[in-house]
């Protein structure tokens, strides 16, 4: 899977980005995602994610992670239509993850675990959203959170 990383904070160590990439590659293998799949991960601060949260979700407050799944159509969006031949030539693009490193650090302290664990959790959580999982209904939440724990535990990133 091809993952593009953008660090708007210019503070995320290269080793941490590599670790998140390894975790997301592991999660992609776990879900049997095709190798020619693409996605992006952007690291921002609370002000940056608050602006995105306000503009796209109508919530004027910072949050930890936002996922923009390209395969999900919004209510007022028209579908992008390709014929099968065109579609076969294009890599699958899951979409974009935006993670607030500030919020991740705050939550790591709140939950009593490492920043590495919190960043990994948020990356996998957002990755599952990009792949169609959600937690709006109790049964969906159970499935998504169970899968999230399974991936993190199998990778070795436990609480």
From Swiss-Prot:
Q: What InterPro entries would the database entry show?
A: MetalPrtase_cat_dom_sf_prd, YbeY, YbeY_CS
Cofactor annotation: Zn(2+)
**Per UniProt, where does Zn(2+) bind?**
125, 129, 135
The EC number of this protein is 3.1.-.-
Q: Main localisation, per the record?
A: cytoplasm
Q: Does the keyword Iron apply?
A: no
Q: Per the record, GO CC terms?
A: cytoplasm
What is its subcellular localisation? Cytoplasm
Instruction: Identify the keywords attached in UniProt to this record, alphabetized.
Output: Cytoplasm, Endonuclease, Hydrolase, Metal-binding, Nuclease, Ribosome biogenesis, rRNA processing, Zinc
An example GO biological process term is: rRNA processing
Q: Which GO terms describe its molecular function?
A: metalloendopeptidase activity; RNA endonuclease activity; zinc ion binding
Q: Which residues cross the membrane?
A: none
Q: Does the keyword Lyase apply?
A: no
This entry's comment on the bound cofactor is:
Binds 1 zinc ion.
Q: What does this protein do?
A: Single strand-specific metallo-endoribonuclease involved in late-stage 70S ribosome quality control and in maturation of the 3' terminus of the 16S rRNA.
Q: What does the similarity note say?
A: Belongs to the endoribonuclease YbeY family.
Which NCBIfam families does the entry mention? Answer: rRNA maturation RNase YbeY
Q: What is this protein called?
A: Endoribonuclease YbeY
Q: What organism is recorded for this protein?
A: Enterococcus faecalis (strain ATCC 700802 / V583)
């Amino acid at each position: 899977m091809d993952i593009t990383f953008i660090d708007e904070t210019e503070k995320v160590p290269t080793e941490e980005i590599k670790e998140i990439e390894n975790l997301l590659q592991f999660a992609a293998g776990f879900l049997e995602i095709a190798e020619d799949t693409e996605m992006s991960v952007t690291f921002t601060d609370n002000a940056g994610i608050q602006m995105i949260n306000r503009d796209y979700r109508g919530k004027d407050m910072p949050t930890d992670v936002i996922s923009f799944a390209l395969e999900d159509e919004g209510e007022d969006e028209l579908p992008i239509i390709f014929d099968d031949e065109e579609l076969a030539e294009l890599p699958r693009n899951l979409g974009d993850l935006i993670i607030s490193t500030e919020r991740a650090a705050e939550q790591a302290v709140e939950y009593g675990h490492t920043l590495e664990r919190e960043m990994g959790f948020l990356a996998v959580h957002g990755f599952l959203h990009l792949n169609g999982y959600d937690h709006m209904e109790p049964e969906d939440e159970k499935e998504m959170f169970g899968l999230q724990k399974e991936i993190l535990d199998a990778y070795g990133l436990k609480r």
